[in-house]
């Protein structure tokens, strides 16, 4: 893809995200600023701008992973557009059957994520190609959620016989002062982090 086209799509996606975002102070707890992107999903054209950008940025992806909850919307929409499988990573107790589990810290507490151990048992993998996985979520804060998701994704890939893979991550926005992007890069030097807008 031509660099000018890429930059054009990136700028349009950034503009649409800025116009859609609302900041709520002291929510869900005092001292926390919550970046709400709900309006993005209410505006077909703005959401489409984001998907257009992702379509060009991640044209070689084989599997999409969506994180509960807004990552489900982003992941499903992108996977459908690209005709790709979409795997869910959910909060503890939401998935049936044997699951891998990872705990993580967030800016206002702790939580746990789970993924089904055999989530990819029906996915067809091309043996000649490195399997490219894209993990999608809305906001990157301290990075704990994404780090736990990367660990779970690695576990489920290996458990389902996929050993040659690379992982990319995409987020609508980040809270820059929390250094989530830097923490991910520090822990995983082989994982890319794509953020449309850093606040």
Curated annotation (Swiss-Prot):
Q: Identify the main location.
A: cytoplasm
Task: Please give the Gene Ontology molecular function terms for this protein.
Answer: adenine phosphoribosyltransferase activity
Its annotated pathway reads: Purine metabolism; AMP biosynthesis via salvage pathway; AMP from adenine: step 1/1
The keyword Cytoplasm belongs to this UniProt entry's keyword annotation: yes
Q: Where in the cell is it found?
A: Cytoplasm
Question: Which major enzyme category is it?
Answer: transferase
Q: Name one GO cellular component term.
A: cytoplasm
Q: Name a biological process GO annotation.
A: adenine salvage
Q: Which UniProt keywords apply?
A: Cytoplasm, Glycosyltransferase, Purine salvage, Transferase
- Stated EC number for the protein is 2.4.2.7
Q: Which CDD domains match?
A: PRTases_typeI (cd06223)
**Family matches, as Pfam families:** Pribosyltran
- Key word Magnesium present: no
Q: How does it assemble?
A: Homodimer.
Q: What is this protein called?
A: Probable adenine phosphoribosyltransferase
Q: What species does this protein belong to? A: Dictyostelium discoideum
């Amino acid at each position: 893809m031509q660099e000018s086209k890429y930059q054009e799509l990136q700028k349009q996606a950034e503009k649409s995200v800025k116009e859609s975002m609302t900041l709520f102070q002291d929510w869900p707890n005092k001292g926390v600023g919550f970046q709400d992107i709900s309006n993005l999903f209410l505006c077909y054209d703005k959401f489409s701008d984001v998907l257009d950008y992702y379509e060009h940025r991640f044209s070689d992806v084989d599997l999409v992973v969506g994180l509960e909850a807004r990552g489900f919307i982003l992941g499903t929409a992108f996977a459908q557009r690209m005709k790709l499988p979409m795997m869910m990573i959910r909060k503890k107790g939401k998935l049936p059957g044997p699951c891998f589990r990872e705990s993580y810290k967030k800016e206002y507490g702790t939580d746990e994520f789970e993924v089904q151990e055999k989530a990819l048992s029906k996915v067809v993998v091309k043996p000649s190609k490195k399997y490219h996985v894209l993990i999608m979520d809305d906001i990157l804060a301290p990075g704990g959620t994404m780090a736990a998701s990367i660990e779970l994704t690695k576990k489920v890939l290996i458990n389902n016989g996929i050993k040659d893979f690379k992982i990319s991550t995409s987020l609508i926005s980040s809270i820059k002062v929390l250094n989530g992007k830097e923490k991910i890069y520090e822990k995983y030097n082989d994982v890319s982090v794509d953020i449309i807008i850093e606040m």
